[in-house]
């Protein structure tokens, strides 16, 4: 009854909300077959190197990875809200959805330095966190013309989604102050794009000869006319700054944080005459 004043233009309105949480046995390797190592919460032993004692070749037994007594599931929690609506006797209708998903306690290795005398590897721990967020809008217009003999419609879909690593252990090279800190996944999406940065095509013979005269090499080869000249961005050990050559160190540049499309859209329509 409270919607009666709007009934001449508002035909439908529905608000939706949902919440759910579930366990997930995937780890940072994201391997669908080799997930959590069996019995990694127990101390295991394995055969080690063989040694000669007197005239006999003897096997040895060594301890496996330090067990993780607190091993548990990763937990995925999803929040979703939506709105269904219709206007003008449902000639214009649509839906809007937004979601947020958080996954915590993802199993993965920690990047810690152990003394060589420790003698064991560390078992992976449930520590990493990752989140997803996004939304989708769908609109449809449907009407009739020519005294109802023609039925036509048009639609538009627009979606956005983004993921982010919230907690993730990385090598010191990727941490604050490291040479590859710009490529850290922390706070970024999975699947960032990295690679060489093209500067320009070598179309001037004089420029090519000048580069050769300086001893400039690209992966051990002389630059050549018509080839791509890449930017010299890093030196040995990924150090920032040019070193007079292009090699594998120069491949570590952040090209884009969007390894997968973040925005998807589509539109279209249809028309019928006398139901055909």
Locations of the language-model features?
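Extracellular/periplasmic, surface-exposed regions of secreted and cell-surface proteins
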Residues: 1-190
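Outer-membrane beta-barrel transmembrane strand signature
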Residues: 54-87, 91-93, 184-275
């Amino acid at each position: 009854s409270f919607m009666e004043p709007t009934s001449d233009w508002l035909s439908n309105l529905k608000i939706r909300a949902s919440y759910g949480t579930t366990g997930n046995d995937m780890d940072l390797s994201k391997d669908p077959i080799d997930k959590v190592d069996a019995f990694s919460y127990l101390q295991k032993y394995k055969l080690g190197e063989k040694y000669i004692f007197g005239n006999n070749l003897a096997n040895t037994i060594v301890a496996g990875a330090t067990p993780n007594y607190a091993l548990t599931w990763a937990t995925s929690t999803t929040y979703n809200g939506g709105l269904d609506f219709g206007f003008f006797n449902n000639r214009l209708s649509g839906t809007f959805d937004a979601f947020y998903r958080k996954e915590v306690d993802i199993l993965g290795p920690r990047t810690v330095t152990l003394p060589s005398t420790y003698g064991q590897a560390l078992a992976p721990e449930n520590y990493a966190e990752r989140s997803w967020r996004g939304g989708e809008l769908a609109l449809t217009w449907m009407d009739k013309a020519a005294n109802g003999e023609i039925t036509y419609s048009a639609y538009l879909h627009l979606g956005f989604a983004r993921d982010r690593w919230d907690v993730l252990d990385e090598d010191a090279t990727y941490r604050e102050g490291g040479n590859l800190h710009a490529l850290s996944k922390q706070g970024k999406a999975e699947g960032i794009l990295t690679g060489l940065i093209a500067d320009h095509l070598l179309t001037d013979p004089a420029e090519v000869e000048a580069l050769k005269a300086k001893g400039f090499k690209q992966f051990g080869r002389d630059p050549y006319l018509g080839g791509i000249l890449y930017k010299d961005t890093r030196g040995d050990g990924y150090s920032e700054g040019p070193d007079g050559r292009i090699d594998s160190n120069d491949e570590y540049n952040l090209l884009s944080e969007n390894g997968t499309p973040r925005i998807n859209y589509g539109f279209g329509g249809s028309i019928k005459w006398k139901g055909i």
